[in-house]
Amino acid sequence: MARQEQQQHLQVLSALDAAKTQWYHFTAIVVAGMGFFTDAYDLFCISLVTKLLGRIYYTDLAKENPGSLPPNVAAAVNGVAFCGTLAGQLFFGWLGDKLGRKSVYGMTLLMMVICSIASGLSFSHTPTSVMATLCFFRFWLGFGIGGDYPLSATIMSEYANKKTRGAFIAAVFAMQGFGILAGGIVTLIISSAFRAGFPAPAYQDDRAGSTVRQADYVWRIILMLGAMPALLTYYWRMKMPETARYTALVAKNAKQAAADMSKVLQVEIQEEQDKLEQMVTRNSSSFGLFSRQFARRHGLHLVGTATTWFLLDIAFYSQNLFQKDIFTSINWIPKAKTMSALEEVFRIARAQTLIALCGTVPGYWFTVFLIDIVGRFAIQLLGFFMMTVFMLGLAVPYHHWTTKGNHIGFVVMYAFTFFFANFGPNSTTFIVPAEIFPARLRSTCHGISAAAGKAGAIIGSFGFLYAAQDPHKPDAGYKPGIGVRNSLFVLAGCNLLGFICTFLVPESKGKSLEEMSGEAEDDDDEVAAAGGGAAVRPQTA
């Protein structure tokens, strides 16, 4: 089978698989990665400013505590971008297979730039109108962000060589960690600058004066700055040629694929149009997504990539979105009434930046350095297992962690759950769908898997706003929930299910994309391929 694949393989694809790491690889990582930097910044920075939005637009000076967003508004502001992302992943994933990766790639970036700026310009003076406008633009921001998931992963996988493909895709995704970190740092800088320029007393000392008028600029500037990295990389994204695998295997233009990659790799590559036509004639397996052939060859794989991403994102996004409430519950952030509005923003940003620096960013880069050594399967299993362990380690002795003197231990344990999410399923669930499906369906299947993940993120962001409420003392406007401790038990259960579902996902380390997808096989080999899941399944002995 290996010899047959070698005979059928186009020279342009073999050249890409065997290429040494070159400058164009790093260029592709930066160009694609800046999209993820922007994605993470835009999606996570909203959790830093929700408390500020509540103070500005929903404070009742007759009440003892500063205002907070009503439950339905908080759920919408936190979760609406995820709804847009889910829709964008499905739409642009499908479009990337129909029109080509490059032609769709610029659309997503422009949407991110325009909607990031528009989010900060949300107009009107009534709270309802401002929040409605903000949610409208954040939905379309999420729609653009959604397209970046399948397109960036697919482009990087189709550009990369076989030996270090996992590290290259992981490096693109790792820019998400820097985006989260940047969101925290930018918020720290802006809140510090405004706090120094417009000092204000704590809410309990001066209810009206604790939120200065200029605080309304703070959240707008933070959201609008998300447009900058995307804008800076637009030109370079448009200069990238279409991937050779799309041009050759989907558009059936071997001449153009060879010409494009000859420039990129700086080597002479034969056109081999005749060979491509022979391959098309010999291998007519142009089955669609909803065909029996796809179900036999890749059905369980798609179920595996979708369910693991879904379960991971329930835990991952709920942690990020209610971490400010966790910090409050362990007294890492003082009670709101003891701070001014800008002081509260500063303290929330400082806490999130510390978690990103210690737990989030290192986990991504451990994946980059180790994924092509130990494989995707082992990293994903380890990640889900350790997340389960640390979640239980937080939940079982939760009352111990919340007593005086034990708060730092809680934060360390909490940081480890983020570390093993990123040195684990948060990275691998992004990588594997870009490697195991046929070129003509690769972007679509990645989009489906990613959309399943965002469905989990929606459950996490909407559901846990309510679930994490204290059963005895819920926040104003909320019904009693199951509390942070029981929420952590639920998240541990999600991680355990993710561990089990990982066994549906094949190992792709060291294999070509065509070997994983079965595109190098004849129709005569279809039966073998249909039962060949075991051939690419990880060895667990």
From Swiss-Prot:
Bias (Acidic residues): 516-527
Q: Which InterPro entries match?
A: MFS_dom, MFS_sugar_transport-like, MFS_trans_sf, Phos_permease
Q: Which PANTHER family match?
A: SOLUTE CARRIER FAMILY 22 MEMBER
**Extracellular compartment residues:** 50-74, 124-126, 190-215, 319-353, 398-404, 469-486
Keyword entries, A-Z: Membrane, Phosphate transport, Symport, Transmembrane, Transmembrane helix, Transport
Q: What is this protein's expression induced by?
A: In roots by phosphate starvation.
TM helices/strands, residue ranges: 29-49, 75-95, 103-123, 127-147, 169-189, 216-236, 298-318, 354-374, 377-397, 405-425, 448-468, 487-507
Q: List the disulfide bonds.
A: none
Matches recorded under CDD domains: MFS_PhT
Name the UniProt record assigns to this protein: Probable inorganic phosphate transporter 1-8
Q: Which GO terms describe its molecular function?
A: phosphate transmembrane transporter activity; symporter activity
Source organism per entry reads: Oryza sativa subsp. japonica (Rice)
Q: What does this protein do?
A: High-affinity transporter for external inorganic phosphate.
Family statement drawn from the similarity comment of this UniProt entry: Belongs to the major facilitator superfamily. Phosphate:H(+) symporter (TC 2.A.1.9) family.
Q: Where in the cell is it found?
A: Membrane
GO biological process assignments: phosphate ion transport
This protein's gene is called: PHT1-8
Q: What is its main location?
A: membrane
Instruction: Supply the Gene3D superfamilies for this chain.
Output: MFS general substrate transporter like domains
Which residues face the membrane's Cytoplasmic side? 1-28, 96-102, 148-168, 237-297, 375-376, 426-447, 508-541
* Assigned GO CC terms: membrane
Q: Where is this region: Disordered?
A: 514-541
Additional remark text:
Although related to the sugar transporter family, it does not transport sugars.
Give the membrane topology, semicolon-separated if more than one: Multi-pass membrane protein
Highest taxon in the source lineage: Eukaryota
